[in-house]
Amino acid sequence: MSNNSREKSVDSSELSNIDYRLFQNTPAWELAKAVQEEDMDNFDKIISENPQIINYQESKYGNTLLMLTIINQQLKPFKALLKKGAAVNTHNTFDGTSPLIEACSSKYYNIIFTKILIEYGANINDIETGKRRQENSTRLTPLMAASKTGNLDLVRFLVSNGADVNYQNEFGQSALSESIMTDNYKVAYYLLQNGANYNLPIFYRYDYSIPIENSVPGDKGKPMFLMDVLKEDESDFYTDEYKYKTLIIDFLKEQGVK
């Protein structure tokens, strides 16, 4: 994007969360441009003159510039923001996500962002905050987010640094259930080997054949446990998913699960 087009006023409601123009017409706009351009000389100058804007949150998603460097995978300004004191445990106003949860949320993200955030004091057991939006029935931790991606190296790093493998949110979701629901069985097997509770339901299956007038208020449906879900899985025989599904089933049988 050219500098001229970037300066053109835009409706922030139409911008995605990767767009630095979210900071247009805010006190942090000049800093946002320096961060996007990775202009460290101008970055240092702006911060020295107005250090408090480093944690400014744009109005649509409530993201800070640190969050945008993670989303855009810009390591140089990411490190610079941290060195200047950017807050690592601030939550945005969209899903209540923090920098660390964001850094763990995509298999395409470099794990170095997560490692550096931990070095700077990010809460490894952070939890998304606030009420859930209507279309969002999750409340993630870094480990839950990582488990959904299938990035085993990232999951290993989090667990080895104290991530809670058995946190369960109000929707009954856990790192184990997230890995199973996304067919990331290699991650699920690792979690089980590191103490994940296999006795909790993976999800609840609602019986839609029951008329609404006959349904029981608050009934979540039939609890589907890990062995139930795996027995229904139809992974192809020669895939990693099938291999690790078999390992999980063997593990469960060793624990007396039928």
Question: Language-model segments: which ranges?
Answer:
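Ankyrin-repeat-protein effector appendages
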Residues: 2-30, 161, 194, 199-258
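N-terminal segments that cap or nucleate solenoid repeat domains
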Residues: 10-61, 65-68
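Ankyrin-repeat boundary/"N-cap" motif
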Residues: 24-31, 56-65, 91-104, 127-142, ...
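Ankyrin-repeat intra-repeat helix-capping/turn positions
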Residues: 38, 73, 107-109, 150, ...
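Conserved ankyrin/ankyrin-like repeat signature
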Residues: 42, 76-77, 112-113, 153-154, ...
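Ankyrin repeat domain, specifically the short helix-to-loop turn at the C-terminus of the second helix
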Residues: 47-53, 79-87, 115-124, 156-164, ...
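Short coil/turn connectors between adjacent alpha-helices in alpha-solenoid helical repeat scaffolds
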Residues: 105-112, 236-242
